[in-house]
């Protein structure tokens, strides 16, 4: 019986990995998404808004190219806290992208752009700024998710458990263990989410001659 159970667990793990839906995210200009699809990937998340406060028109074209190749297309939004209001940034993005994507993922990580960084001390203000962005998108009837890692969330919001206001929205979390599985999430949980929706499990790799991160759900 013990041997049977062990074999069963191995089979179930194999099935789970086989059934995983894999995708990429990228920021570089790219037009060979058919190569990505043929490599076994089903979705692409393109950069839609740049860290210094500007719509990514390259990302918009990437989205069109990805969908034309038969991939599911989402966008990620790297907000600038400081130069423009949350509402202004969302409006700029929405004027270009409209409803062409499935979900827009708000990128919560350190921002290197001058005048656009999250506050190092006002964690409550950081949480409110994220709330303002989410509110602006939901007011436009867009589907919104959050992208973060436990480390980045803790740094920006004050702790891993802080700013637990967004659990009604899907979570895309990053943990680079080269394992397309959510089994690690309890150790790397953040923001009050008990269940993630997407995992970024490989960062800064190359696929079809373009720089990407690898994801699964």
List the model feature ranges, each with a label:
Residues 19-142:
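Substrate-binding cleft of extracellular glycoside hydrolase catalytic domains
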Residues 19-27, 35, 164-217:
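Functionally critical loop-and-helix segments that line ligand-binding/catalytic clefts
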Residues 86-94, 154-163:
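Distinct, well-ordered alpha-helical segments
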Residues 103-105, 155-159, 164-171:
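Accessory recognition modules or surfaces
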């Amino acid at each position: 019986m013990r041997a049977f159970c062990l074999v069963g667990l191995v089979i179930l793990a194999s099935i789970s990995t086989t059934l995983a839906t894999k995708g990429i995210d990228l920021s570089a200009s790219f037009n060979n998404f058919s190569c990505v699809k043929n490599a076994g990937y089903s979705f692409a998340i393109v950069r839609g808004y740049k860290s210094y406060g500007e719509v990514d028109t390259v990302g918009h074209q990437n989205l069109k190219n990805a969908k034309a190749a038969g991939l599911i297309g989402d966008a990620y939004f790297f907000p600038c806290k400081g130069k423009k209001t949350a509402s202004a940034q969302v409006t700029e993005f929405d004027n270009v992208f409209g409803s062409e994507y499935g979900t827009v993922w708000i990128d919560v990580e350190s921002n290197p752009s001058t005048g656009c960084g999250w506050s190092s001390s006002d964690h409550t203000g950081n949480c409110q700024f994220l709330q303002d962005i989410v509110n602006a998108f939901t007011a436009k009837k867009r589907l919104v998710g959050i992208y973060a890692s436990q480390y980045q969330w803790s740094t920006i919001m004050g702790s891993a458990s802080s700013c637990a206001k967004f659990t009604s929205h899907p979570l895309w979390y990053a943990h680079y263990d080269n394992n397309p599985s959510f089994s690690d999430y309890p150790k790397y949980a953040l923001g009050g989410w008990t269940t993630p929706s997407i995992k970024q499990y490989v960062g800064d790799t190359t696929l079809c001659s373009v720089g990407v991160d690898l994801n699964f759900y």
